[in-house]
Amino acid sequence: MTYVSLADLERAARDVLPGEIFDFLAGGSGTEASLVANRTALERVFVIPRMLRDLTDVTTEIDIFGRRAALPMAVAPVAYQRLFHPEGELAVARAARDAGVPYTICTLSSVSLEEIAAVGGRPWFQLYWLRDEKRSLDLVRRAEDAGCEAIVFTVDVPWMGRRLRDMRNGFALPEWVTAANFDAGTAAHRRTQGVSAVADHTAREFAPATWESVEAVRAHTDLPVVLKGILAVEDARRAVDAGAGGIVVSNHGGRQLDGAVPGIEMLGEIVAAVSGGCEVLVDGGIRSGGDVLKATALGASAVLVGRPVMWALAAAGQDGVRQLLELLAEEVRDAMGLAGCESVGAARRLNTKLGVV
């Protein structure tokens, strides 16, 4: 089947996934106000295109963390991808490799980080801070040894947000899906009505990260450390002072603090505040190449895309993810050209205006 929009892939995923697994992917925390706001915020951003530009050689490539990428985009970390397709993370990594796009291996991946990184391409590793600091730093070492190019340190999960869909469903992992990077025990598989077994188990495994945790990670690796989950300008400035190679402006896809400001709302302020001191990425609600253009016009180095990649994985495995990335590449190039931009650098010089949705 050919998909012409990301919405097509969402519908296809909904058709094939069990309801509780689709809810695990789609849901946010609490009333899902931040989840909805992520889309609303993007829809309010309008780009002011430039005309009469030379568009004979439009390129969507960027340099990020010292290497070339085909798009101003990376695959976001998503846990337990074998929930959505038997090949899970391996299918996503292969498609991202072939598309020239970085992909982020999650601490809670359902295939080991070494197996995923062996696919090649541009793997990054996402780190959750565990109660045992030694285990956290061991994951960093393993990621570096496996060839990962950056450590994406998620800092907005002292514990999981209240994800009511999962609680109502009594969501638990099926026996054939595990956290492959460490012995996670069996708690996440124990189904209890009114309780998310995944959230309950995460609360036992995770610890709140602090600036001291950031320093410990930086001291343990030569890789760029990217802090994911930054929303306050003050935290962005401190991240630069702490030596972060990048930040991801993010409210965790609306899955942590319900009511947290959308990342796209804070992006311009944060880009101005860090003043080139580190790479600034953004995520939350990216659903088209036009959204990627909006983010770059607001100053983003790149965007992270999560849920749509999982829709594609569920719909058609590696081929689905390939189609998604090809579709986004086509949409990004099209949007850039229509805005009068021959490069991502030119897109970052576009002006924007907030409208009413």
From Swiss-Prot:
The EC number(s) this enzyme carries: 1.1.3.46
Keyword list, A-Z: Antibiotic biosynthesis, Flavoprotein, FMN, Oxidoreductase
The keyword Flavoprotein belongs to this UniProt entry's keyword annotation: yes
Protein known as: 4-hydroxymandelate oxidase
Cofactor(s) required for function per UniProt: FMN
Family: Belongs to the FMN-dependent alpha-hydroxy acid dehydrogenase family.
Annotated residues for binding of FMN: Q126, T154, K228, D283, G284, G285, I286, R287, G306, R307
Broadest EC class assigned to this enzyme: oxidoreductase
Domain FMN hydroxy acid dehydrogenase span(s) in chain numbering: 1-357
Organism encoding this protein: Amycolatopsis orientalis (Nocardia orientalis)
Function: Catalyzes the oxidation of p-hydroxymandelate to p-hydroxybenzoylformate in the biosynthesis of L-(4-hydroxyphenyl)glycine and L-(3,5-dihydroxyphenyl)glycine, 2 non-proteinogenic amino acids occurring in the vancomycin group of antibiotics.
